[in-house]
Amino acid sequence: MTATSGKLMKGATGDWEVVIGMEIHAQVTSKSKLFSGASTAFGGDPNSHVSLVDVAMPGMLPVINEECVRQAVRTGLGLNAKINLRSVFDRKNYFYPDLPQGYQISQYKDPIVGEGEVTVELDGGKTATIGIERLHLEQDPGKMLHDQSPSLSYIDYNRCGVALMEIVSKPDIRDAEQAKAYVTKLRSILRYLGTCDGDMEKGSLRADVNVSVRKPGGPLGTRCEIKNINSISFIGQAVEAEARRQIEIIEDGGTIEQETRRFDPDKGETRSMRSKEEAHDYRYFPDPDLLPLEFDQAFVDALKAALPELPDQKKARFIADFGLSPYDASVLVAERESAAFYESVLEALSDRGRDGKLAANWVINELFGRLNKEGRDIASSPVSSAQLAAIVALIGEGTISGKIAKDLFEIVWSEGGDPRELVESRGMKQVTDLGAIEKVVDEIIAANPDKVAQAKAKPQLAGWFVGQVMKSSGGKANPQAVNDLLKSKLGI
């Protein structure tokens, strides 16, 4: 598979191509940990969700959590990936205080999921296909706390043993925009599947980003890994900063050292942490306490049959069934909750074919716009899907105009209430009586003879007359009827 061309970076010696691969660590949505029955609940008191297995007490043996296996397979299917019916757990050996076993149980040569791909949407309607190298299961380590004492570090093992899916991409990403789009799309897929909540603030989704630079078409450069980035915007900033650093070093005659770095968002730069380890440094070998993980194709087929509709499928359906533009459909399906809200609006409409596109416009422009302005999410929207559907239906029926609909939306947002009852009680119905509209049109034309003469020479001035009629009618006149009457009477 050929990577999609990205934005080249300018250097003193010309253009440079950035080559990016990513390792996403996604915490598996499961009530208990990968190899123990301890809770995975976030936010408990330190060391309150810990079993004897998690802290490697002598004689304690790991037992695989079948739900975590199911979630990994479901994720692999969602990534259009090969599911391996036999996989092996290995010990990844390194010593660090947050890993009480002295090793991490992971998967090395035989992961549970093989190659797949993710298609991401880019600016300008472009797309890029990013290859997935593999997905494997492993344990999350505990958490070191260095700010509790001036002389001591503490360890919270609540997270230790929580199941992680490490999703490794191929080096197909070519710029910061593609990197952000990839993580955004991957997080969306995981949320649709219900296999990871994707909450980067809580550490449920973390990214390690491998960056190298080269002259376009040249051999791959030496890569550096930027660890544990917990924000999509920071991912873009880190890629830009690290690529710029490498370009400057090479153009100054230096060489890039393969190392692990971290991103400092306050200074907008990456800093060295340690030299980059190779696989042999970890002395992987199969875990003798765990048998190879094996299941049959029927197990996979049953999970595949029960998968929900994923973002790409939902987007295609919205375009085909409701005539939405690819952009509007992408906005609606980006988050599972947004798509569900739109579909709830559609369910409440009697004429979805007529009002589906109008409903999308109102969800995206009016509702999302207002939610973003006030820093709310869809779950806390003061306007329900049923209320928004009623507003859309009133427009579609011709009961209210678009302008009146915006006023109605403000009332429902601030005060609540049934939109149909509000239209009746507040006299907001659109005027469709041609005689009444014609009377207003005649009055406006009679009062502005100079504008009439100008409009005959410049037909675009008809818009001024439309505005005056709508103003005079309090926004209640049917806009199409106003347009038709004005064109007829002005002879344009």
From Swiss-Prot:
GO biological process: glutaminyl-tRNAGln biosynthesis via transamidation; translation
The EC number(s) this enzyme carries: 6.3.5.-
Superkingdom of origin organism: Bacteria
Gene Ontology molecular function, alphabetical: asparaginyl-tRNA synthase (glutamine-hydrolyzing) activity; ATP binding; glutaminyl-tRNA synthase (glutamine-hydrolyzing) activity
Catalytic reactions on record: L-glutamyl-tRNA(Gln) + L-glutamine + ATP + H2O = L-glutaminyl-tRNA(Gln) + L-glutamate + ADP + phosphate + H(+); L-aspartyl-tRNA(Asn) + L-glutamine + ATP + H2O = L-asparaginyl-tRNA(Asn) + L-glutamate + ADP + phosphate + 2 H(+)
InterPro entries: Asn/Gln-tRNA_amidoTrfase_suB/E, Asn/Gln-tRNA_Trfase_suB/E_cat, Asn/Gln_amidotransferase, Asn/Gln_tRNA_amidoTrase-B-like, GatB, GatB_C_1, GatB_Yqey_C_2, Gln-tRNA_amidoTrfase_suB_CS
Family to which this protein belongs: Belongs to the GatB/GatE family. GatB subfamily.
Subunit structure: Heterotrimer of A, B and C subunits.
Physiological role: Allows the formation of correctly charged Asn-tRNA(Asn) or Gln-tRNA(Gln) through the transamidation of misacylated Asp-tRNA(Asn) or Glu-tRNA(Gln) in organisms which lack either or both of asparaginyl-tRNA or glutaminyl-tRNA synthetases. The reaction takes place in the presence of glutamine and ATP through an activated phospho-Asp-tRNA(Asn) or phospho-Glu-tRNA(Gln).
The protein, known as: Aspartyl/glutamyl-tRNA(Asn/Gln) amidotransferase subunit B
